[in-house]
């Protein structure tokens, strides 16, 4: 601590960088703030940070697709935002280095509607398409048979294509649909299918299926 006698500093109080000017008994004093050393993050903290960063980056990609409204619908009338909910459901799909490693833990949709059952997927190489088949739960009412199909196809190079209800053109009662893949796309490896309510604004959880390429 040092007393300041120069007239230029008589009216100064407050903090400048790591120095504090303050008055006491009509005198101005200068005191240096203690330097706080930052703790080095642990390996566990660094791993969590890499994982979290990767999931956030993945969410930002999804924001440009139809899937954004799915996650917004899931948090309606709650205190959670869509990004936090997406991170909560998808962290397990990424490893400690932030790499997507477990496709079975990847979630593209959440919601209360019934999922497709017995989902099967096959790559039609000559047609550059994927054929999907599914069954419906007998407890699904007739009014739900018009629920629209939404599909996400993931490729071996980790790219993916989102097919909105308008693009699939399929509804729950159809039980099958064939989706054309983009030209020059990589080999498809996984499909995620779920249903969107026609007027309810609700969705189902997605159903993961490994695509047969044999």
Language model features by range: what are they?
Residues 74-214:
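Charged linear interaction tracts used for macromolecular binding and regulation
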Residues 1-117:
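Long, polar/Ser/Thr-enriched low-complexity segments
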């Amino acid at each position: 601590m040092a007393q300041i006698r120069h007239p230029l500093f008589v009216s100064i109080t407050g903090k400048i960088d790591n120095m504090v000017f303050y008055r006491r008994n009509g005198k101005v004093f200068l005191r240096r703030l203690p330097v706080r050393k930052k703790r080095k993050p642990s390996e566990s903290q660094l791993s969590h940070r890499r994982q979290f960063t990767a999931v956030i980056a993945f969410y930002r990609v999804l924001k440009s697709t139809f899937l954004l409204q799915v996650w917004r619908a899931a948090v309606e009338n709650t205190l959670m935002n869509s990004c936090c909910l997406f991170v909560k459901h998808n962290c397990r799909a990424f490893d400690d280095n932030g790499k997507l490693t477990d496709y079975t833990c990847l979630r593209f949709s959440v919601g209360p509607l019934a999922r497709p059952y017995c989902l099967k997927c096959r790559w039609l190489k000559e047609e550059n398409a994927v054929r999907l088949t599914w069954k419906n739960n007998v407890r699904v009412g007739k009014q739900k048979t018009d629920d629209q199909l939404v599909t996400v196809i993931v490729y071996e190079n980790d790219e993916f294509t989102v097919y909105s209800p308008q693009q699939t053109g399929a509804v729950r009662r159809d039980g099958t649909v064939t989706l054309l893949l983009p030209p020059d796309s990589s080999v498809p490896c996984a499909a995620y299918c779920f249903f969107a309510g026609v007027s309810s604004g609700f969705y189902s959880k997605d159903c993961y299926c490994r695509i047969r390429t044999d």
